[in-house]
């Protein structure tokens, strides 16, 4: 069994824990902070790897990006599509009572050339896979129909596909 994941809009997820409730406009000290590679597809590949299921994460970003070096550190196999841009950061602020405030950056802007390269990489790396999972939000420049169009292309080539995202159009 081999599962390929595509995370079109990966992130470096930073979680900051506060000792007092978040106060708008104030300077506050954190009592804890962690950062992890993120994005739904990345998270799926991490869970599969921990479970012993072969997986390959396809991630747009530079090979030296902290998200990709973090994936290397936890032995998640990946292939990257160079974008010339850093992978976005998402920030979660956790109040003492557990209330969370999330700030999600938009991600790398995709033009037609970058989209074509991503499509080609997904099709190329999916050869021999049992499943291809398209997961997470779409970055700027990829239309809401992107996943449904990629699913159609993958299914036409005989691949089993799954999509994990809210609001996917035309599936």
Language-model regions, residue ranges each:
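Short glycine-enriched loops at secondary-structure junctions
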Residues: 8-13, 84-88, 168-169
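Glycine-rich phosphate/adenosyl-contacting loop at the front of the ribokinase-like
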Residues: 1-56
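General beta-strand structural signal in soluble alpha/beta enzymes
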Residues: 6-8, 59, 79-80, 133-134, ...
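Conserved beta-alpha-beta core of the PfkB/ribokinase-like small-molecule kinase fold
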Residues: 131-171
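Short, basic, glycine/proline-bearing loop/turn elements
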Residues: 27-32, 105-106, 135-136, 155
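Conserved N-terminal subdomain of the carbohydrate kinase-like
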Residues: 24-26, 49-129
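Short, acidic Gly/Pro/Ser/Thr-rich loop/turn segments
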Residues: 11-13, 98-101, 139
